[in-house]
Amino acid sequence: MTGVQTCALPIYGIRSHGLVYVPIYCEHLRCGKVNTDAEPVVLSQDGSVIAVDADSGFAHPAIDIGFDKLGPLAKAMGCAVLTVCNSYNCGVLGYHVERLSADGLVAIGFTNAPASIAPAGGRRPVVGTNPVALAVPGVSGQAAFVLDQSASVVARSEIMTRVREGRSIPEGWALDAEGQTTTDPAQALKGSMAPSGGYKGFGIGLLVEVMAAALSGATLGIDASPFSGTEGGPPRTGQCFLALSPDA
């Protein structure tokens, strides 16, 4: 599923998370950020709440295992919850919730990431870009709409793309290490991402941190190794998905 998503994203017009990520994934498989022998397992199922451990591997296989149970449970009980811990980057969160909406479910997803957003007025990153996504089912197995947005003005991967392409970033996307606005993507990666809507974006980041990391038992963003470069071991971040049946 990791490969399927990576190949599909450029079709959606999402270049920053598509095929450009293949070299990064390969690098992280070689350096140990991703466990090449990962065997995700269901840790527990209590009523309609499922917990999966990704074993420091890609999030996608762990999410797949959880979704096998999540959809049927949501339809049988009206709503169900899946948490995933100890996972690597899950790619575009909206892709996952859209899969649930294709099964006729309203789906909400959360995923935390290594810290890259500082509190309003601060300089030290505390939470990650921490996206939240919503998918609503439509007709003929198609989603009526999918909302996928991060707690930052723009995804961190967009900054990484600008570094690779040697292009500047718009003012207001990120701050340098001194907390000043910068248009240099390299300086932005040394500093912090600008929260969307100021303190409100940081608040969304905290909400996602609770849902994706605290509830799942994953590593908090402030302690997780980065999704870029080779420093540190597996980031062991987490995800949380809520599935609701409109027929309940």
Where are these regions (language model features)?
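Acidic, glycine/proline-rich low-complexity segments that act as flexible tails and inter-domain linkers
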Residues: 15-33, 161-163, 168-170, 177
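Predominant activation on well-ordered alpha-helical scaffold segments within soluble catalytic domains
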Residues: 8, 22-27, 68-71, 98-101, ...
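Phosphate/diphosphate-binding glycine-rich loops and adjacent basic-rich segments that engage nucleotide
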Residues: 116-186
